[in-house]
Amino acid sequence: DASTAANSDSNDPVQGCIGAGTGATVGKIMGMKQAEKSGLGIYSVKAGTFTMTAIVVVNALGDISDYETGKKLAGLKNSDRTEYISCEETLYQFMAPRDMFTGNTTIGAIITNAAFNKAELNKIASMARNAYARCINPVGTMADGDTIYAASTAKRGNGEAVHVDI
């Protein structure tokens, strides 16, 4: 919770079931009984004086996999919750009408201190959106409201910010 984060001896950000990630779940195609808890994740990279941070709440209809190995990390469980089953295959098997259109939005932000213009930030967000497709399956369904934003904290017009070409 917020008090745990505030009283922590670490400079690392608190992640998981906190803030917007509190109610986040994945693998919800068969309802919450077979879904799995997810949450909020944060990752930062430094390049010289520049920092790029991604913060994402994973609240997807689909399964979550490691983008390098394809190993499922979280998602739809079988009815006795002993193993994972494919959310994508289940979606195709059970195309019967059901209310899947609420509670499935993975939302994120890419934040940097480098000076990017609006078009460049839009491109950064577009590239970051591709990460969803590498890790969430299925992604971008009619039942998902996935989105990602990009923003810069660089000041404009005072000569402090350095422009970075992408």
Provide a role label for each language-model segment.
Residues 1-166:
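A structural signal for small-residue-enriched, beta-sheet-centric alpha/beta enzyme cores
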